[in-house]
Amino acid sequence: MNHPSELKYATTHEWVRIEGDLIVTGISDHAQDALGDLVYVEVPEVGSHMTAGTQAGVVESVKTASDIHAPVSGTVVEVNTALEDDPDFINDEPYGKGWIYKMKPDNIADVDQLLSNTDYEAGL
């Protein structure tokens, strides 16, 4: 499995990358591999405020469906609309084209409370 060291991870298998004062979020390589071929992604609404740990969306595969959780609290500022037509971007490039949404966190320091790649992998 590929879990880049520059990212942070939630125990619910989301990853976070800081870009300026925003965070970019998707699901980990481990999560997409466990789900199998994705066929549908429900993204959060732009402008919606989410609390850490609450449901932010859903990914569906040929095997099952799984909730996407907000890794930190904040407001959604952009979603990856390309996933509507190509949910398999998450399977092919979970940390690239497969990002799910961007958020303005209430407190960017909350990202520091998430797991490093080594701690995330140790919990798998």
Swiss-Prot record:
Family membership noted in the UniProt record: Belongs to the GcvH family.
Which keywords does this chain's UniProt record carry? Lipoyl
The cross-references to NCBIfam families, in alphabetical order and at most eight, read: gcvH (TIGR00527), PRK01202.1 (NF002270)
Q: Which residues does this entry mark as bearing N6-lipoyllysine? A: 63
**Lipoyl-binding domain location:** 22-104
Q: What organism, scientifically named, is this protein from? A: Acinetobacter baylyi (strain ATCC 33305 / BD413 / ADP1)
| Protein name as it appears in the record | Glycine cleavage system H protein
Keyword presence, Lyase: no
Alphabetized PANTHER family for the sequence: GLYCINE CLEAVAGE SYSTEM H PROTEIN, GLYCINE CLEAVAGE SYSTEM H PROTEIN-RELATED
